[in-house]
Structures are given as structure tokens and as C-alpha cells.
UniProtKB/Swiss-Prot annotation:
Keywords: Oxidoreductase, Pyridoxal phosphate
Protein name as catalogued: Probable glycine dehydrogenase (decarboxylating) subunit 2
Lineage: Bacteria, Pseudomonadati, Chlorobiota, Chlorobiia, Chlorobiales
Species name: Pelodictyon phaeoclathratiforme (strain DSM 5477 / BU-1)
PTM sites of type N6-(pyridoxal phosphate)lysine: K269
One example of a Gene Ontology biological process annotation: glycine decarboxylation via glycine cleavage system
Alphabetical list of Pfam families matching this protein: Aminotran_5, GcvP2_C
Entry EC no(s): 1.4.4.2
Gene: gcvPB
Length: 482
């Protein structure tokens, strides 16, 4: 049965609250709030009892899918289990009750946490300095590109091109375009890595930087990264790393050691903060020595035993947020790093790589692998075999997976893989869970061959059956009158 909207449950006069009396004298609302800010008609809020509100949202939560419920295999999203200790520290009154405009002497604990987190992130990635301010990965991308632009301006360079590999996240060219750059695509080779000949042919005096993800979006490590770094820097360009896949690198290797000048982190992914449903995120940016003068203000500095916000950065590109970043995510990431330590972080990446390769080995006979293995933390399969032989598309496979109790993986991305199924199991899934997930995909491959109509009509057991995705995207109806 369809769950009704909270407004459909409303009945006039029904209440779920009671207010105690007070001794304050009554007075017209206009005496307190200027009339231009007052409504001319009453708000059409739902009138429901407390029990109805609780039951409504509990029912909705039971319909929802989340990482606390089961494996969440979205490729390039790192939907790992988020330790509850992270939420505990985030909820401590000394953090949760803060206001960003409080005097510095009353926020020393928060400033210390941010200072130490930046230092830990700097060390993890091998960079010279880190800003915590950007609110998400794409926000960090834009910040990094603006830092690159400022650097070139500071040396009198008017470079206007930015190279982006063809397997990149769509936010890479979008961020570069927002910063005013012309986007040039660099091809991949037959092994799924950057084509050095194509890169060499596109490097000229107008190229400001190359944006690269390592491991790339197919889950492959760029084995020629040192050669790429030399080519880019010999051209007077800078090297940018999208840190979306840093869950494969912790304690094993560092972007700074590969020659990257800028890297953004996705704290909500790599360092375990809940981020389904659009946020919150955090996208700190690490830079090499020559970009430090341009970092965002304010910068947290330590003077003796005191932490302060410093605005004395005349070459800074300014702010990317009104305040200092998504602080709750920073607290969670700090807790995660401190709980695991250097050895634990390395085990995170080692186990993520092991899980991805183990799961891939279970699926190879039933699905196509467009590029060679081994992979790092994720892999990209193709549903071409099922589509060509049985008329079952990757979309159908993803929908059918819902009937088996799993969230679907990322599909149709990256664009260079036909009928793409991008899967990232993360380090927090057990062998038993991976086995069950693999068996679900193997069963779907068998169904595609023997009962394709079942797969193309899926899902059939979920509370809501197959949606018209195109209509849902183009004809939004999410508003209500208040």
C-alpha cells in the first residue's frame, strides 16, 4: 500500500503538541515582528498526532535503503560503513553547541581539531598544506582549479586550457569550465589508463593543468604517473588529482610523492561520514609549496599553545564558504583517523583492494570486463553480453538487483564503458556479504538468459515498482503549498 504524504494524514483540529502557560503579557505579533515579514494567510501545516508523525517517518525509514541496512556498492562513491563513534564525538556538546562567530578563546578545542586534522591530511597525501573549507568534492575541485588559475596569474601566465582525461568524473570539466577554462579531453589507451602519446600531443603553452584521478574511475592505477608528472611539469603546467578514489591509497602511496600540485579529499567518502541523499560532504584541498600563498582564508595557525584564525594572506583567493567548512564532517573524519592510526588506514586500503579483486573474480564468467585486471578498490563491468544476446540492459540488471535486497551499483558511468556497471565494495564488507552479492548478480545473469522478461520488468518485490526515470527527471513535482 502506498505511504501517504504527511499532508494527506492531516485532519483539522488534530494536534500533537501542548504548550505550557507563561506569565508574559500577550501583545500583537506586529509589535514584535515587522508586518512586512508576516504571512497574510495561515501556514497550511499538517495537523497530525504525535503517534501518527512517528509511525509515518518510521514507515518511510523502513522503505529507505542505507549503508546500515546492507552493502551499498555504488562505484566511485565509497559507501563504507560509518563507525558510530564518529557520531558520538560529533554530538559532544563542546562541538555540537558551537557557533562559528564565538570568540576564539571559547573555541580552542574546535580550532585545535581543525588544525590537527589539516596536518594529518597533509601527511596522508604528502602535500605541503591543506585547507578544510570546501564543502564537498566538486567544491574542492573548483577551489583547486581557482588556486591553479591564481598561480598562473601570479607569474604572468595567461594559460586558458585545462586537460581532463576521458574517464573523469563529470564534475572535473564542469569545475574547470566554471573557472573559465577551455576543456580539452585526453584519451585513454587500450589498458584503460592515460594515453601518453595523446597527452603529449595536447600539451602546449596554453595548458594550465591536467586533471587526473588515481586510481582512475575504472579502478586502475595510473602506472605511468611519474612520467605523466614529468611531462606536465616540463610544460610549465600543474598536475591536479581528483581524490575521489583515495580509499585505495591510504598508507600505501601519496599523491604528493607522485608529483601532484593539488589534490582534493572527499572526507565523507574516504574518512567515513554519512553522505547518502546529497550530503553533508567535505572537500579539503591539499597543495604543493608554491600554491600555499593562495590558500583560502582564514588559515588556522598555532601560536604557542593558542590556536587562531589568520586572515593575513594578501595573495589568497579569499573564501569558498562563509565560515570554516562542514565542521560536523571534520569531527567525524578526525575521529576516524585517530581511531585507526597509520597502520589502520593502510589496512583500510589493503582490504578495499582485496575485496574488489575477490568480488571481481566471482563475476568474471558471467559479465564482461572491458579492461584488464587486477584492479584497485573498484571495478567496472559491462552488460554488453546480456544486452546483445538477450535484450537485457544494464538498467534492467540494476533494477533486478533491488529485488535481491541490494542497492544497485553505479551504472552507465564512466561513459567510455558500454553498458557500464561500476562496483565498489569498500573494505567494510565481509566475505559472506560479498558472496551473497555476487550470487545475486550471477542469478540475474542466468535470469537474463533464461527468463529475460523477469529482468526487464524488475523490480517486482519492492514497495514501488519500476519508475519512468526520464519522466521523474523532467517533470518534478516536489512542492507543497504552505
Amino acid at each position: 500500500m502506498r505511504e501517504k504524504l504527511i499532508f494527506e494524514l492531516s485532519r483539522k483540529g488534530r494536534k500533537g503538541y501542548s504548550l505550557s502557560g507563561n506569565e508574559l503579557p500577550e501583545q500583537p505579533l506586529e509589535n514584535i515582528i515587522p508586518s512586512k515579514y508576516l504571512r497574510t494567510t495561515p501556514a497550511e501545516l499538517p495537523e497530525v498526532a504525535e503517534s501518527e508523525v512517528v509511525r509515518h517517518f518510521v514507515r518511510l525509514s523502513n522503505l529507505n535503503y542505507h549503508v546500515d541496512k546492507n552493502m551499498y556498492p555504488l562505484g566511485s562513491c565509497t559507501m563504507k560503513y560509518n563507525p558510530k563513534i564518529n557520531d558520538y564525538t560529533c554530538d559532544l556538546p563542546g562541538f555540537s553547541a558551537l557557533h562559528p562567530l564565538q570568540p576564539g578563546e571559547t573555541t580552542q578545542g574546535a580550532l585545535q581539531l581543525m588544525f590537527e586534522l589539516a596536518e594529518m591530511l597533509r601527511e596522508i597525501a604528502g602535500m605541503a598544506a591543506v585547507t578544510l573549507q570546501p564543502a564537498a568534492g566538486a567544491h574542492g575541485e573548483l577551489t583547486g582549479i581557482l588556486l591553479i588559475k591564481k598561480y598562473h596569474e601570479s607569474i604572468g601566465s595567461k594559460r586558458h586550457k585545462l586537460l581532463v582525461v576521458d574517464s573523469a568524473h563529470g564534475t572535473n570539466p564542469a569545475s574547470a569550465a566554471l573557472a573559465g577554462y577551455d576543456i580539452i579531453s585526453v584519451k585513454g589507451n587500450a589498458d584503460g589508463r592515460t594515453d601518453l602519446d595523446d597527452l603529449r600531443s595536447k600539451l602546449d603553452g596554453d595548458v594550465a593543468a591536467l586533471m587526473l584521478t588515481n586510481p582512475n574511475t575504472i579502478g586502475l592505477f595510473e602506472t605511468e604517473i611519474l612520467a605523466i608528472s614529468k611531462m606536465v611539469h616540463d610544460n610549465g603546467s600543474l598536475l591536479y588529482m581528483d581524490g575521489a578514489n583515495m580509499n585505495a591509497l591510504l598508507g600505501i602511496t601519496r599523491p604528493g610523492d607522485m608529483g601532484f600540485d593539488v589534490v582534493h579529499y572527499n572526507l565523507h567518502k574516504t574518512f567515513a561520514a554519512p553522505h547518502g541523499g546529497g550530503g553533508p560532504g567535505s572537500g579539503p584541498v591539499g597543495v604543493s609549496e608554491k600554491l600555499i600563498p593562495f590558500l583560502l582564508v582564514p588559515v588556522i595557525v598555532k601560536e604557542g599553545t593558542t590556536y587562531k584564525l589568520s586572515y593575513d594572506r594578501p595573495e589568497s583567493i579569499g573564501r569558498m564558504m562563509n565560515f570554516y567548512g562542514n565542521f560536523a564532517v571534520l569531527v567525524r573524519a578526525y575521529t576516524y583517523i585517530r581511531m585507526l592510526g597509520p597502520d589502520g588506514l593502510r589496512r583500510v586500503s589493503e582490504n578495499a583492494i582485496i575485496n574488489a579483486n575477490y568480488l571481481l573474480s566471482l563475476l568474471l564468467e558471467s559479465y564482461d570486463l572491458p579492461y584488464p585486471k587486477p584492479v584497485m578498490h573498484e571495478f567496472c563491468l559491462s552488460g554488453d553480453r546480456q544486452k546483445k544476446a538477450h535484450g537485457v540492459k544494464t538498467l534492467d540488471i540494476a533494477k533486478r538487483l533491488l529485488d535481491y535486497g541490494f542497492h544497485a551499483p553505479t551504472i552507465y558511468f564512466p561513459l567510455i564503458v558500454s553498458e557500464a556497471l561500476m562496483i565498489e565494495p569498500t573494505e567494510t564488507e565481509s566475505k559472506e556479504t560479498l558472496d551473497v552479492f555476487a550470487q545475486a548478480l550471477l542469478s540475474i545473469a542466468d535470469e537474463a538468459a533464461n527468463n529475460p522478461a523477469l529482468v526487464t520488468s524488475a523490480p517486482v518485490t519492492t514497495p514501488v515498482k519500476r519508475l519512468d526515470d526520464a519522466m521523474a527527471s523532467r517533470q518534478l513535482n516536489i512542492c507543497c503549498s504552505l
